[in-house]
Amino acid sequence: MPKRAKKNEEGVDGEADNGTAAAKKEKKGKEPEAPILYEDPPEKLTSKDGRAANMKITSWNVDGLRAWVKKNGLDWVRKEDPDILCLQETKCAEKALPADITGMPEYPHKYWAGSEDKEGYSGVAMLCKTEPLNVTYGIGKEEHDKEGRVITAEFPDFFLVTAYVPNASRGLVRLDYRKTWDVDFRAYLCGLDARKPLVLCGDLNVAHQEIDLKNPKGNRKNAGFTPEEREGFTQLLEAGFTDSFRELYPDQAYAYTFWTYMMNARSKNVGWRLDYFVLSSALLPGLCDSKIRNTAMGSDHCPITLFLAV
């Protein structure tokens, strides 16, 4: 996902245009355009087939768990009160987790995955009010699993997969690896889906369509919006999965989940939609709402929340 330019793996999308190049080219004296902001509409708590939502899942790339806790991220979580909380880019070994989160009584069942080789890198977490039937880590391939990017929890009616998808990196140096990941991850998800429908959530590190970022023309060769990454996501959807937000809001522009820290991108709403809830087709009848909580602060991403009838 896009980050500050000084970072290595996570710096890529932050180096993308993100509106800054265009801004520098503007003539002196030209009035800047007023930002167009996205307002999260009222929650829909009933599915198309008339069922009431009985599952609430929140996903948030926290860009460093310890810093996010210090920025009062948990206060927002307690107000949102999801049944399941999924976090990405925790950048924190299990032994260094803040007591504020490990001791949360609201979520007695907590699961963590981190990078085996690098401290302060990658990492995902899942916090549940109800104990899953089973929990697994990774996708069964060592080259991917050592980076701590996936947790899968099995519940009676569905699998929940939270993922922090690899960034193609500065100069697209990891694009080939990302393409391999996309193939292997898709195969993993299809294998799960053959057993039980699934919800995939997390930072998938791709803006799928031009509507999913502010400046598509300036970012075609940048990580997160390359043809290869976009095609990888298209192939995932063609394998029988659905982008829940676009299912409900197909033409909604300016709805982003990430903003680089540079150039006041967030206040200008110069962003990318990189965070998703992707559903198996079997779960679509129970889809109630897919929310972008863009007023929640504490990270360069905002949280997203899914309401589902299962």
From Swiss-Prot:
Site annotation Transition state stabilizer: residues: N205
Q: Which residues bind Mg(2+) 1?
A: D63, E89, D300
Similarity remark: Belongs to the DNA repair enzymes AP/ExoA family.
> Where is region (Disordered) located?
1-51
In the record, biological process GO terms are:
base-excision repair; heart contraction; heart looping; negative regulation of apoptotic process; positive regulation of gene expression; positive regulation of gene expression via chromosomal CpG island demethylation
Is Metal-binding given among the entry's keywords?
yes
Q: Where in the cell is it found?
A: Nucleus; Nucleus, Nucleolus; Nucleus speckle; Endoplasmic reticulum
Q: What is this protein called?
A: DNA repair nuclease APEX1
A GO MF label: class II DNA-(apurinic or apyrimidinic site) endonuclease activity
Please note every region of biased composition (Basic and acidic residues).
41-51
**Active-site positions, per UniProt?**
Y164, D203 (proton donor/acceptor)
List the residue(s) that the UniProt entry marks as the site Important for catalytic activity: D275
Known catalytic reactions: Exonucleolytic cleavage in the 3'- to 5'-direction to yield nucleoside 5'-phosphates
EC number(s) per entry: 3.1.11.2, 3.1.21.-
Cofactor: bound how, per the entry note?
Answer: Probably binds two magnesium or manganese ions per subunit.
The record's listing under SUPFAM superfamilies reads: DNase I-like
Any idea which positions bind Mg(2+) 2?
D203, N205
Q: By its UniProt entry, which InterPro entries does this protein fall under?
A: AP_endonuc_1 (IPR004808), AP_endonuclease_F1_BS (IPR020847), AP_endonuclease_F1_CS (IPR020848), Endo/exonu/phosph_ase_sf (IPR036691), Endo/exonuclease/phosphatase (IPR005135)
